[in-house]
UniProtKB/Swiss-Prot annotation:
This is Cytochrome c-type biogenesis protein CcmE. Heme binds at H122, Y126. Belongs to the CcmE/CycJ family. InterPro entries: CcmE (IPR004329), CcmE-like_sf (IPR036127), NA-bd_OB-fold (IPR012340). The chain crosses the membrane at residues 8-28. It comes from the Bacteria.
Length: 163
């Protein structure tokens, strides 16, 4: 073989090795690329206990029960299925019934999702109270221009405080 042919074979071999490596990495990550699963997907797939994943949906109205030692149970729904969730810890300020939520954790044998982390989702119109106050103070707040009312202050337990 000439020098040019050897160089082409070398480049082709390196390209094939990189393509195989990339394919293996993508195949290994295929189960973790999904941002979250809905309660309907969990019901269809019958996830085994102990498998970690992210659960996303809305906090079902009337399902939040606060227990001792920061224990909270609630249900996540996608309006087609519901999944009970157990969480121990402080909830985000935006957590409330009817609000979007993403919980990370694993299924327990009884069909309850045990969350280690709970994230509250909000839409693009949410504005923290501190930002709204700063805009009002600087004179840039435009009343009635589509800005939502600022979120009420909350205690460490997530309860709304009286203004």
């Amino acid at each position: 073989m000439t020098r040019k042919q050897r160089r082409l074979v070398f480049i082709g071999t390196c390209g094939a090795v990189l393509a195989v490596a990339l394919g293996l990495v993508l195949w290994a990550m295929s189960g973790t690329i999904v941002f979250f699963r809905s309660p309907s997907e969990i019901a269809r797939e019958a996830v085994a206990p102990g498998v970690r994943f992210r659960l996303g949906g809305l906090v079902e109205a009337g399902s939040v029960v606060r227990g001792p030692d920061s224990q909270v149970t609630f249900a996540v729904t996608d309006n087609a299925a519901r999944l009970p969730v157990r969480y121990r810890g402080l909830l985000p300020d935006l957590f409330r019934e009817g609000q979007g939520v993403v919980a990370e954790g694993a299924m327990e044998p009884g069909g309850v999702f045990r969350a280690d982390t709970v994230l509250a989702k909000h839409d693009e119109t949410y504005m923290p109270r501190e930002v709204a106050d700063a805009l009002k103070k600087s004179g840039r707040w435009q009343e009635g221009a589509g800005h939502p009312a600022p979120a009420p202050p909350r205690t460490a337990s997530g309860e709304a405080r009286a203004p």
